[in-house]
């Protein structure tokens, strides 16, 4: 095995189990330095210069202290592309990629049925790193109007950098989902709001609790649907005719979120399972009768 890989692996073994240390070592080399796994196996990794060694040791030092890889290298993969990531925003998850796929497919089908006219209007409520809004803007070839909200100025700064990085046309606004109602309607409302209850903290990994923004993760035990009530009201008031709302949810409450959408007048409400077999998404539509 390559000498640099072994150096990284040995450093990470001081904190992680063998299997996780190995996976992280491969990911660090590929995502942090552009070294593919095949090059490691073939022992064709070029020697690191002084600057690369310094950066590597800085990253390893942070990871040995518990910093997640994505924060240590400053970026995370999402749908095969890199997005700037720091502790002001959540690290994008694979499940959220599925939410983007769902929304992108619906948007294209909606436009095809619509047959032209005004651009599609998309709202990403609680954008974080901006990955959902940016990917949807790119899927629509920057021909849709995409607006993205977050209550955190720090998160919005990261999201704007990511939009510039990817050449995506997104309008970012500081908005509180719980206390704001826009004046105009949207064809698609998408959101991945906080949905983990305080009681679930005990089951979570230390690196998530210690480094990821709690405001983007947790909701009170006595009000787990806090953000979904606001989103349901938003959809009731501002979802365009034939439009759709799609949200990521806690698997324990997906059915309740779908019922909440139905109670607010939406049609074709349903839950959708993720790649791990969990009920992870809830959708609803504003059907014209």
Per-region residue spans from a language model:
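Conserved hydrophobic residues forming the short capping helix/wall of the S-adenosyl-L-methionine
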Residues: 12, 107, 163, 235, ...
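Residue-level signal for inorganic ion chemistry
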Residues: 28, 66, 96, 132, ...
């Amino acid at each position: 095995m390559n000498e640099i890989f072994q150096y990284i692996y040995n450093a990470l073994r001081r904190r992680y189990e063998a299997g996780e240390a190995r996976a992280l070592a491969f990911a660090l080399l590929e995502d942090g330095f552009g070294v593919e796994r095949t090059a490691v196996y073939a022992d064709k990794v070029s020697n690191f210069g002084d600057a690369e060694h310094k950066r590597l040791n800085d990253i390893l030092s942070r990871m040995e202290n518990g910093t997640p890889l994505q924060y240590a290298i400053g970026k995370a993969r999402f749908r095969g592309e890199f997005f700037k990531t720091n502790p002001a925003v959540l690290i994008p998850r694979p499940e959220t990629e599925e939410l983007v796929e769902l929304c992108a497919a619906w948007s294209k089908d909606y436009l095809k049925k619509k047959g032209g006219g005004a651009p599609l209007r998309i709202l990403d409520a609680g954008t974080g790193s901006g990955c959902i809004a940016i990917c949807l803007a790119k899927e629509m070839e920057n021909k849709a109007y995409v607006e993205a909200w977050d209550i955190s100025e720090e998160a919005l700064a990261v999201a704007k950098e990511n939009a510039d990085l990817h050449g995506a046309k997104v309008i970012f606004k500081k908005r509180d989902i719980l206390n704001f109602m826009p004046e105009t309607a949207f064809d698609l409302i998408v959101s991945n709001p906080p949905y983990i209850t305080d009681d679930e903290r005990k089951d979570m990994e230390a690196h998530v609790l210690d480094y990821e923004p709690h405001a983007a993760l947790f909701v009170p035990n006595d009000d787990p649907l806090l953000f979904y009530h606001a989103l349901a009201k938003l959809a009731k008031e501002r979802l365009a005719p034939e439009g759709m709302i799609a949200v990521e949810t806690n698997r324990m409450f997906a059915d309740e979120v779908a019922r909440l959408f139905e109670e607010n007048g939406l049609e074709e409400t349903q839950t959708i399972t993720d790649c791990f077999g969990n009920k992870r998404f809830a959708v609803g539509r504003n059907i014209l009768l």
